Amino acid sequence: MTTAHILGFPRIGAQRELKFALERYWRDGASADAERALVDTGRALRAEHWRIERDAGLDCVTVGDFAWYDHVLTTLAHVGGLPRRFGFDARALTLADYFAAARGNAAQPAMEMTKWFDTNYHYLVPEYSPATTFGPGVEWLFDEVREARALGYRAKAALVGPLTLLWLGKARDGLVERLALLPRLVPAYRALLARLREAGVDWVQIDEPIFSLDLPDAWRDAARPTYEALAPGAPKLLVATYFDDASEHAALLKALPVAGLHVDLVRADAQLDAFVADYPADKVLSCGIVDGRNVWRNDLDRSLARLAPVRDALGERLWVATSCSLLHVPVDLAHEPRLDEELKTWLAFAAQKTREVAALRDALVKGRAAVAAEFDDAAAAAAARRTSARIHNPLVKRRVAALTDADARRASAYSVRAAAQRARFGLPLLPTTTIGSFPQTPEIRRARAAFKQGVLDHLGYLEAMREQVRIAIDKQLAYGLDVLVHGEAERNDMVEYFGELLWGFAITSNGWVQSYGSRCVKPPLVYGDVYLPEPMTVGWASYAQSLSAKPVKGMLTGPVTMLQWSFVRDDQPRATTALQIALALRQETLDLEKAGIGMIQIDEPALREGLPLKARERAAYLDWAVRAFGIAASGVADDTQIHTHMCYSEFGDILPSIAALDADVISIETTRSNMELLDAFETFDYPNEIGPGVYDIHSPRVPDADEIERLILLALERIPAQRLWVNPDCGLKTREWRQVDAALAAMVDAAKRVRQKVEEAAPA
């Protein structure tokens, strides 16, 4: 019979149970009681997620999709591959060790973190050196298999594949080629797979999303011998590709000695023909037709029409699946009691998507009539969404159509603007600032919760937030920072805040997804044309500026990041939606400028994240992304300084486009990579000002002034002092004030030391 399965389920829990359990564990100092509570939470979550999968009608549950922090880190733990610098015993790895690798400890900084392909999920980057070894690791996967079997479930295991695991890492300490480690890694996988077979696992899903990339020949050539080594003695292997078109590798993948392949038909529907043609008789083909990355309800009739010919060709060897893991969508629409009822009928979260997969399987096997009610309901929702008047705003469409190239460019060149800004602000060499947010304290959270519950009235909430702004300004003045921020106490999220105030956006109550570790975000839903009805940030920025003579930056989230970190409508091009958001932000920048705010930061941390995986598609994306930023930023006068911020990015390959943004100042995350990101600036003469991060805010570890001074000096080897800023890697929302106080004081101290050295070294 045709099999229905998913590639993975969200691990955080419907009420973010994993997040809160992790934070209690860390807060309690990883005590034995705290660890027991954490382990119990994980076990309960897995059982609940498997129950949802079973109740939806899936033919198997997926084990191995759970991770305490990150699935790449967990895979490294399974094959004994955590960085050697931590000195951990791979076979005796504890949870405390695991979290030390993720978050750093007193002896070692945390592992580097970056985006998982083109998603908003972050993985921990493996570190590979000539001394790297692999072997037996933790027992967690086998524990999960035993749990699932004890509950009576048929379990399919899921693992990040060996080629993808190597591809995602960084070569260090003189290692020339990561593939050189493959002969060491394959035996570790082979042993892991053999044990899974002994444990009674019939199928193992091996995730190899790198086959959706433009792979070098050496990596393509490594695929067949790798799987020839893995297949003997293993359970049946399902090699899963997703996130883009893998058809250029179709012949290679179909020739692998595995039992099946998975392809993503949501992101690359056209690839199906290349796989179905001459498909091997000994393989299943898993078709990912339910979107694992967006929240819109599946058009079941359309999907059935797409799958029916495949069913005719392959029979029971057709499997129905989600396009990728459901890690990227919220858990359950049932937990959205306050969401607009019409909008709700257009949506499907993870729990609903599992049922969509099973319903498609049922229609293929039993006929549409067997699930007619579900199909008819989905068809009615799709028709209503196509014709809903709430989606379309004629005024917005006219404004987008009227945009010209001049609207996306500043009136004067950077050199002219820089002179005007120096005259206006009079900043010292190596000016110090922060990225925007300060700690979201319990006081802030209590006030926000009381306001949302109606316990605190609007005026009381404003007063509470103003007090937090005053605290943030006073602290920054005490540190000695040169450019201040208001701290964003009023914002629960850098995208959701704006989504609450813009027309065309909707906000969920419980639509959380994991960003990394315990960090969860609640992406807004962009369901219709975007319009700014009134100023969003002017009152907060103006109040903060009234508290100090030093400049205070206005803080906005850029159009591409708003797009990338939301669940975006799929009925028009993303470029069009980006321009709509950009027009709204342009009006906000003009309102800020009119209110006397002389520096405005438009954050674009997701610019590179939106880059298509295929090289041939990138130029078009960068063109509209740069244009959208320009529309948002270019209406202001020469002496208004536009900042932007980018984090978690390796962007050497898009530096020309970053330069084309023409922001007066850009700040970037560089600490975890030890300023390696700045290597690109040795060959590309970035024309404007730049602030490479000198403090890793993702780790609780507090750097001292000597460490920060070393990083500033490293930056000065690549960036002229006249164009260098000093700032943390990212916003400080997730840190505690005691950490921030120490780190920013050290940062200002380090900047003053280096400033003195530079000035003393300058010719008289």
Swiss-Prot record:
L-homocysteine binds at I435, G436, S437, E488, D603. Its cofactor is Zn(2+). One of its GO terms (molecular function) is zinc ion binding. Zn(2+) binds at H645, C647, E669, C730. Its EC number is 2.1.1.14. InterPro entries: Cbl-indep_Met_Synth_N (IPR013215), Cobalamin-indep_Met_synthase (IPR006276), Met_Synth_C/arc (IPR002629), UROD/MetE-like_sf (IPR038071). The active site is at H698 (proton donor). This is 5-methyltetrahydropteroyltriglutamate--homocysteine methyltransferase. It holds the Pfam family Meth_synt_1. Signal peptide: none annotated. The gene is metE. Pathway: Amino-acid biosynthesis; L-methionine biosynthesis via de novo pathway; L-methionine from L-homocysteine (MetE route): step 1/1. PANTHER family: 5-METHYLTETRAHYDROPTEROYLTRIGLUTAMATE--HOMOCYSTEINE METHYLTRANSFERASE (PTHR30519). Catalyzes the transfer of a methyl group from 5-methyltetrahydrofolate to homocysteine resulting in methionine formation.
